[in-house]
Amino acid sequence: TVIVPLSARAALRAIDTLCERLGRAIPVMVSGTLADASGRTLSGQTVEAFYASVAHARPLSVGLNCAYGAKQLLPYLERLAAVAETRISTPPNAGLPNIMGGYDETPAMFAADCAEYMRRGLVDIIGGCCGTTPEHIFELAKIAGDYAPRRLPAPRHITVLSGLEPLRIVPEANFVNIGERTNVAGSA
């Protein structure tokens, strides 16, 4: 799990280097944490830009976790599912922390909220993060088998660049000028 996507990119590069040395692939799951209700990472990336920034590594899954309970994470998983060509993983929290730093969401409440992800076909791999207990995971496991994994979309074969927002370069765009007039000394 990463809070800053640049950390994920550095880790993915290190894993890639290790795989080259070992002569074999290692399955990698990348999970990001959103900083607040804006749905952005701590560095300001949208969910879509976060996916674009790690997709080149072809991870086993890309996901979101922590920071939110299962109910609050739902709209961001929908956005991730709309762009992800990989498996999607998520271990949400057992709700949001209470004033004492504990988590009040019961195992049954947690499982019911997570069932919505599976019912909508948004995730392939699911678990629990902050505040979850073996009982939370037990309740989740009891219902997970009732749902099919998410259907992977057909590859789109388009270039997607990531900054704070994704930039999709599609044939209909004709010409895309990137970085023009970013020179602070001026540009003719």
Question: Which residues fall in each region the model found?
Answer:
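Domain-level signal for soluble alpha/beta catalytic cores
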Residues: 1-188
